[in-house]
Design a protein with these regions (language model features):
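Residues forming the flavin
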Residues: 1-206
Length: 206
């Protein structure tokens, strides 16, 4: 049986699932086994502690992807992308297709985060510059983002003074990784791995 439009509110250590939907209200379900498949979500500017003002125009790459592909809405025309993950590089190409100018892709690591294939097809083929060991030092703007200040980092990810550069833009897309949805796992008493953030499992993924 499938229950659509149903949200799980709680999972108890006794394997009881508390859920809610429009038709039945709050319901309680019980089973011998519960499969946790909540997935993950994108890191936001708060989770990477991005400094600077808080104007509009700062989005995750996945949000921008949904707007362009499904809702037909362009996030902006002059774009900087933080992070060289696959979604970020794919969105660099997609924004270019839609007429935007992608000024730069910044990556804090000294290496590419995504697939080499996407780097070639999404950045190199469209002459979109990639700067490794660079990050956003500051967001500039009031109501809407007007620019970002980029900065080079050393091997310990510490900013290097004197390497700052102002890059005008009206949109900043974040492609800085994913974090697991752990709220229900915690409520169910599942032990979490501090290294990866996900649940500790055995060889059978239990």
């Amino acid at each position: 049986e499938f229950m659509m439009e149903t949200m799980v509110l709680d999972i108890t250590p006794q394997r009881k699932v508390i859920a809610t939907n429009k038709k039945q209200g709050v319901i309680e379900l019980e089973g011998r086994s519960i499969v946790l498949a909540m997935g993950c979500r994108e890191r936001t500017r708060a989770q990477i502690q991005l400094p600077g003002a808080r104007p509009s125009g700062v989005y995750t790459a996945g949000t921008a992807q949904r707007w362009v592909n499904i809702e037909g809405y362009m996030p902006g025309k002059k774009v900087v992308i933080l992070g060289s993950g696959d979604i970020g590089m794919i969105m660099a190409r997609r924004m270019t297709f839609e007429g935007a100018k992608v000024e730069r892709v910044l990556e804090i690591q000294p290496f590419l985060s995504g697939l080499s294939r996407n780097y070639v097809q999404c950045l190199l083929d469209f002459d979109i510059p990639l700067q490794l060991q660079h990050t956003v030092n500051r967001i500039i703007g009031n109501d809407r983002i007007e620019a970002i200040e980029s900065i080079r980092v050393d091997d310990n990810f510490s900013p290097i003074p004197g390497t700052e550069e102002i890059i005008p833009c009206d949109t900043l897309l974040l492609s800085v990784g994913l974090i697991p949805e752990n709220e229900l796992s915690k409520k169910a008493g599942v032990i979490l791995d501090p290294m990866i953030g996900g649940p500790v499992v055995n060889d059978d993924y239990e």
